[in-house]
């Protein structure tokens, strides 16, 4: 279709970011990446020798380098006519500039630091993901991200002066520990809100086969995040490593029971094939025992809160080194402190 077609995936993503940004600006949730600007330009700026040398020679951000090299290989195969048809590139490209998340994606963070994360880290991160979905669905029940995998969620380091944060989600209040990080959902090129943000990508034959459609299903994104997170290609350590809290594993299996992890109800890529809303982000936050401590009106004992704060501060300080191996043996002892 035309580059000016608002239903093209690239344009639908931009429109979706604009629609969702109001939730951040109105302080209903901080967990959405904000757009800054977009423009069109020639692809030559990204594939010429100068660009290649500049990006590939950088020592930081191995993931970015790897993805760029893959892009160059596809581009060069395409212009030679050796690539598949979907590897052909237009000479004019659309560039989206967005808010920067300074700690990379959640998959990389988990892989680097899971051995040293506190139980409260897992709980708060999962709360943040579910809360932003619940907030969006509260106004747009038919919203679907459709690709909410762990590496499409970014992480931002935030100030930890304020020890607890108050969340308002679907007319309920939650008091949540400040762990020093905010997740930011990102990559909306499969996303849609029928009648508000329509997306041609979710009306094709191949997406229908994997249940990526515009049909309302508030469970779909929840299932896709948790079920793909524990797959072999992502973060299987979550279910196998003893350092991951058992209550977090039990929580995941309540949200995605065994019969919804593999089998006839699930595509080989981990996608949910039923139209059933097994549960919703709002119901999970309001009813599941995993988040009970965030709902309770009773303040936790001061000694326990202070201990959590100390351990969280220690984690943030050490994680700033960017090296997951720097944690000493004392940090492992923290596992006994919090649920």
Question: Model regions: which residues?
Answer:
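Catalytic activation segment of kinase domains across protein kinase-like and atypical kinase folds
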Residues: 142-218
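Conserved structural core of kinase catalytic domains
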Residues: 30-119
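Core residues of folded domains in eukaryotic genome-function proteins
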Residues: 29-34, 92-96, 127, 139-151, ...
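ATP-binding glycine-rich loop module of kinase domains
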Residues: 1-34, 38-47
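Conserved beta-strand elements of beta-rich interaction domains across eukaryotes
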Residues: 1, 40-43, 101-105, 160, ...
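Helical subdomain adjoining the active site within ATP-dependent kinase catalytic cores
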Residues: 200, 209-339
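Short coil/turn segments at secondary-structure boundaries
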Residues: 1-3, 47-51, 109-114, 196-201, ...
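Conserved kinase catalytic-core helix
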Residues: 20, 113-145, 150, 159-160
